[in-house]
């Protein structure tokens, strides 16, 4: 095959266009998100010392954390502080106020929510401290479903030289005084999300723990 000077110029121009294409840094923002919610009631003012209250194999003594055993049957609109990470392929929404969970993950190329995205927040009383919700991705430690899965967490946004961004959500577990952090990281031009974990033992004694992520997805007869 013979390449003419005109063909060579076309190839050169095309290569220049491709080389000039730059990948945009990940966008990160904090925004208000209103979601219909069935609120949890006020916690019991009396401390819970009763150990025989077995929840998923755990002892029922949760002092010094209060216990909530009431849920409202009336739905209200509640505004949450949502942390959004986004690139050209993926949008991730985290809700630090609901246990530091991934609330939604959207494939922007086809509009598909690849995690189960709730339209209504409706807790059930199956958590060690009381309220628990499904959907999205729940990060659990130091035992089974995280005791504080419905409690608000702190968060901070972290920028990296390669244009990626991480939102770190963290809390101090009141039962064994350990600290757990989960980081949700999105990279420029990449169609995947990365999770990072940091655990700290703030005591002078060894502490046992497990770590697992509980992801919810919407399925049908053709789900793979």
Per-range role (PLM):
Residues 9-65, 82-86, 90-152:
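Acidic-aromatic substrate-binding/catalytic surfaces of carbohydrate-active enzymes
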Residues 128, 137, 164, 207-208:
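Acidic, low-complexity intrinsically disordered regions
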Residues 125, 134, 161, 204-205:
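Intrinsically disordered, low-complexity regions enriched in Ser/Pro/Gly/Gln/His and often acidic
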Residues 3, 48-77, 82-86, 134-192:
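Extended, loop-rich substrate-binding clefts of extracytoplasmic carbohydrate-active enzymes
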Residues 10-19, 142, 153-159, 168-170, ...:
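Intrinsically disordered, low-complexity boundary segments flanking structured domains
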Residues 72-74, 86, 92-110, 169-220:
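Acidic, contiguous internal or C-terminal segments within carbohydrate-active enzymes
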């Amino acid at each position: 095959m013979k390449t003419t000077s005109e063909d060579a110029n076309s190839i050169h121009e095309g290569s220049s266009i491709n080389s000039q294409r730059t990948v945009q840094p990940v966008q990160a923002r904090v925004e208000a998100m209103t979601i219909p919610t069935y609120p949890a009631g006020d916690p019991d003012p009396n401390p819970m010392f009763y150990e025989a209250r077995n929840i998923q194999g755990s002892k029922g003594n949760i002092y010094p954390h209060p216990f909530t055993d009431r849920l409202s049957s009336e739905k209200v609109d509640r505004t949450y502080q949502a942390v959004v990470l986004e690139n050209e392929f993926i949008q991730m929404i985290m809700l630090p106020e609901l246990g530091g969970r991934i609330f939604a993950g959207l494939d922007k190329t086809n509009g598909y929510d690849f995690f189960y995205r709730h339209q209504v927040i409706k807790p059930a009383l199956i958590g060690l401290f009381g309220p628990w919700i499904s959907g999205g991705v729940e990060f659990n430690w130091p035992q089974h479903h995280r005791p504080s899965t419905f409690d608000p967490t702190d968060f901070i946004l972290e920028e990296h030289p390669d244009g990626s961004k991480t939102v770190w959500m963290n809390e101090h577990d009141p039962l064994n005084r350990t600290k757990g952090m989960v980081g949700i990281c999105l990279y420029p031009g990449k169609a995947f999300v990365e999770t990072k974990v940091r655990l700290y033992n703030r005591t002078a004694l060894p502490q046992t723990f497990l770590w697992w992520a509980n992801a919810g997805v919407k399925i049908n007869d053709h789900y793979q």
